[in-house]
Amino acid sequence: MSLPRVGLVVLLLAIATGSLAESANPSAPSRSQSMIDTFQVMCTLELPDFERIAAKATVLRMRPEADSKPSAPGDSGFRSKSWIGNLTTGPFVLLLDETTGPKGKATSCAIVGEVPDLDAFRADAVAAMKLPATPPPEMGNDGSRSFIWDHSFGPGTTLILRDFKPAGKPGIMLKLISAQPLR
C-alpha cells in the first residue's frame, strides 16, 4: 500500500473511531483538537509533497478555493492551491505551496481556521506534536505573531504556528515547510 493510501486509511480510521467514540461519549473533540488532528493527517504523516497532498484533498472531496501556477523564468517557479474543508467543529482552509529555484524546492502545507483560545491552542499543539518548549514569537507588521520550530520534523523542516492575538483576531495557521536542496 502506498504512503498516500496509508495516510487516507489512517484518516478514515480516525474519523470512524471518532464517530464511534462520539456515539459512546457525547463530548466531541474540541475545535483545537480537531484542527491539530487535521493538520497532522494532512501535513505531517509524511513530509509535504504537493501532488500527494493535492490528491488527498481531492479524495476527501474538499472544495477547491484557489489554484495558481504563475509562469516563471528558467528553473524557478511557484504554485499554490487551497481548499475549504469542514470539520464537525467548523470550517478550515488547507493551503499548499511549492517554490522551486536554483537551490532546490520548498513545499509547505498549512491548516488555517478559527479557535476560541489561541494560547490554549498553542499549548495543545505543542503537547500533541511533542515539540520542544515554545520559542519567543516573531511579531509581524500585520499584528500577527509566529512561533517557529526548526528541524522539528527532520532536517530541512520548519513548523510555524501563527496567530493574530495581538490584533484581537481569532485565526490560527499551522504550517509545515520542507526544503530540499537540488540533487
Regions found by a protein language model. Give the residues of each.
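N-terminal signal peptide c-region/cleavage motif recognized by signal peptidases
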Residues: 16-18
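Bacterial N-terminal signal peptides that target proteins for export
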Residues: 1-8
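Glycine-rich, aromatic-bearing surface loops/beta-hairpins
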Residues: 144-183
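Compositionally biased, proline/threonine/alanine/serine-rich low-complexity intrinsically disordered stretches
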Residues: 21-29, 100-103, 182-183
